A protein has these predicted regions:
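Midchain, well-structured core segments that form catalytic/ion-binding scaffolds
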Residues: 3-186
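Acidic, glycine-rich active-site loops and adjacent beta-strand->loop/helix elements
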Residues: 33, 217-218, 273-277
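Generic recognition of stable, solvent-exposed alpha-helical segments in well-folded globular domains
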Residues: 47-51, 96, 195, 227, ...
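Generic, well-ordered alpha-helical scaffold segments in large soluble proteins
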Residues: 55-58, 100-107, 199-203, 235, ...
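Active-site-adjacent substrate-binding region
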Residues: 56-60, 64-70, 222-265
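A structural preference for short, hydrophobic beta-strand core positions in alpha/beta folds
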Residues: 69, 123-125, 211-215, 246-248
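Zn-dependent metallopeptidase/amidohydrolase metal-coordination segment
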Residues: 157, 164-179, 184, 243-278
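C-terminal structural cap/anchor segments
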Residues: 175-231
């Protein structure tokens, strides 16, 4: 039913060496439910990349620290469950850091209850990395992760409780002189998908990143007068003695790809019930 678009934003930068007397800490966020970035995007679940960017933003300011690396997510069409970042500190600036992280963990759990439960935010000492992200690049990257659209953008005006347009901040990799962000955008409306892609492109361009769009495919507009749909409904009713549920879903289907190749083809999509596909 839905059209999708893959967005990849990239940036290369020259690494800097941390001060020799610095110390490093790894902050890890885990325990989120994750899920399918289409079917479950409307459930208000936490996005690990978004949440950790928020944590890193505050820690970088409060503790005058520097970003060495950031990594979260592994699939474009899955809401990321985990993310981690390595930050570098002056030894004297780490006082109160563990308590700060513990309080932040409690805050996030309170914000997302009861949708999420058992979110963990931990911090641990790690070996001092050989390089850190330059301050300007660091700020631009964290700011763009904070600012970019994530989650439901708009519902379908004529179909109550059904998502029209959404995006998923799926994968973030920063480190080794490179930064890469991958987002999956979805919409049942071509023009809204284009608007979302343009908005995301503009956002990442302000951070100095190069943006490429790929992997787009057509949606599949439902036909309530479809002969095969009516035949299928009658067959289902005879077999099970009840009316089948005919629904629009916020996810890509093979029918969209096939329909783009063979215009006007009468199609339906049916199968077993799917719960928590990711």
């Amino acid at each position: 039913m839905y059209k999708r678009q893959d967005l990849t934003a990239t940036l290369e930068y020259k690494e800097e060496a941390p001060a020799a007397d610095s110390v490093a800490r790894k902050i890890t966020l885990k325990g989120l439910r994750g899920g399918h970035s289409g079917l479950e995007i409307n459930q208000g679940r936490g996005n690990a990349n978004k949440l950790l960017a928020r944590v890193a933003h505050d820690v970088l300011i409060e503790f005058d620290s520097q970003l060495a690396s950031f990594e979260g997510g592994n699939m474009r069409n899955a809401i990321p469950r985990e993310a981690c970042a390595v930050l570098v500190f002056n030894p004297e600036d780490t006082e109160g850091l563990e308590e700060y992280i513990k309080e932040y963990e409690a805050q996030i759990n309170a914000e997302y209850a009861p949708i999420e439960s058992g979110i963990t935010l931990t911090i641990e000492p790690v070996e001092l990395p050989a390089a850190i992200v330059p301050a300007e690049i660091q700020d631009n990257m964290i700011n763009v992760l904070m600012a970019c659209q994530d989650g439901v953008m708009r519902m379908i005006p004529t179909v109550p409780d059904t998502v029209e347009t959404s995006s998923n901040l799926a994968i973030v990799i920063i480190g080794g002189g490179k930064a890469e962000v991958r987002i999956l955008a979805r919409s049942s409306c071509d023009t809204m998908k284009e608007f979302l892609a343009d908005s995301l492109t503009a956002c990442f361009a302000m951070a100095g990143m190069k943006v490429e769009l790929s992997g787009g495919y057509s949606g599949w507009q439902p036909n309530v007068d479809s002969p095969i749909l009516h035949a299928m409904k009658e067959s289902y009713k005879k077999q099970f003695g009840t009316e089948p549920a005919v629904k629009v879903i916020h996810a890509g289907l093979e029918c969209g790809i096939i329909g783009a190749i063979i215009p006007g083809l009468d199609m339906i999509s049916f199968g077993p019930t799917l719960r928590s596909p990711h």
